[in-house]
Amino acid sequence: MDLKATIRTLPNWPIEGVMFRDITTLLQDPAAFKEAINRFYDRYRTMKIDKIVGIDARGLIFGAPLAYKLEVGFVPVRKKGKIPFRTIGAAYSLEYGESMVEIHEDAILKGERVVVVDDLIATGGTVKATIDLVEKLGGEVVECAFVIDLPDLKGREKIRDYKMFALMEFEGE
C-alpha cells in the first residue's frame, strides 16, 4: 500500500509558504491506518522494547495502538499543564518563543528501553525535548519513529545521536 498517497497536502496552511502534511486522511482510511501501525510493529516486534512514548498530540494516535500491539506500556508526553500528578518538563524553541512538554516523573524506570513516536519530524524541537525527559528519568531511547519526515527542515540534525525511522518523506518545507 502506498501510504504516502493517503496524506493530504494543504498549501499555505496555517501560514503562507507552508505545505501542511495532513495525516487525518490516513487516519480516516482504516486499511492505511492499520498498515501504518503494522509497519511500525514489524520494525519493533523483535527489539527489546519496554515502553512506547507518544508525543502530544498526534504521536498519541500512533503510539498507543503500537504499544498495545507490542504488548508494552504506553507513556504520553503532553504539552505543559495537560497531565495530572507530579511531572518533569523540558522546553523547546518555537519560531516565536518557547513551549514545554511534560511527563509523569514515574512514567519510565531506570534502564527501560523506549521508542519515541510522533506523527512527523520537522525542526526536531519537540522530539529532542522528549528524548531529554526520557533520559532524565533513566530511560534509553532505542529509536525515534515518525510517520513523516520533512528532511528539508533538518529535524534529524537535532537528534543525530539517535536512531530514527520514518514511514515516508516529503521534500520541501
From Swiss-Prot:
It is found in: Cytoplasm. Transmembrane segments: none annotated. One of its GO terms (cellular component) is cytoplasm. SUPFAM superfamilies: PRTase-like (SSF53271). It catalyses: AMP + diphosphate = 5-phospho-alpha-D-ribose 1-diphosphate + adenine. PROSITE patterns: PUR_PYR_PR_TRANSFER (PS00103). GO terms for biological process: adenine salvage; AMP salvage; purine ribonucleoside salvage. Pathway: Purine metabolism; AMP biosynthesis via salvage pathway; AMP from adenine: step 1/1. InterPro entries: Ade_phspho_trans, PRibTrfase_dom, PRTase-like, UPRTase/APRTase. It is an enzyme of class 2 (transferase). Gene3D superfamilies: 3.40.50.2020. Its EC number is 2.4.2.7. One of its GO terms (molecular function) is AMP binding. Disulfide bonds: none annotated. Keywords: Cytoplasm, Glycosyltransferase, Purine salvage, Transferase. Catalyzes a salvage reaction resulting in the formation of AMP, that is energically less costly than de novo synthesis. Homodimer. Belongs to the purine/pyrimidine phosphoribosyltransferase family. This is Adenine phosphoribosyltransferase. It comes from Desulfosudis oleivorans (strain DSM 6200 / JCM 39069 / Hxd3).
